[in-house]
């Protein structure tokens, strides 16, 4: 798929498309209002685990 530029997984909220479902699931967090990663010491919260560092 990558070499043929096929992107069968399409976001239903924007024009984003990708080659696999896991990338689409990760992208869907962008549209979500849920911040599941929260700091225990302050008010910081994020949608993505890679943005959360101690």
From Swiss-Prot:
It is found in: Nucleus. It comes from the Eukaryota. Keywords: Developmental protein, DNA-binding, Gap protein, Metal-binding, Nucleus, Repeat, Zinc, Zinc-finger. A zinc finger (C2H2-type) spans 1-3, 9-31, 37-54. GO terms for biological process: segmentation. GO terms for cellular component: nucleus. Its main location: nucleus. GO terms for molecular function: DNA binding; zinc ion binding. SUPFAM superfamilies: beta-beta-alpha zinc fingers. Gap class segmentation protein that controls development of head structures. Belongs to the hunchback C2H2-type zinc-finger protein family. This is Protein hunchback. It comes from Calliphora vicina.
């Amino acid at each position: 798929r990558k070499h043929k530029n096929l992107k069968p997984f399409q976001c239903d909220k924007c024009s984003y498309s990708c080659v696999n479902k896991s990338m689409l699931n990760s992208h869907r967090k962008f549209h979500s209002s849920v911040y599941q990663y929260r700091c225990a010491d302050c008010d910081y919260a994020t949608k993505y685990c890679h943005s959360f560092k101690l």
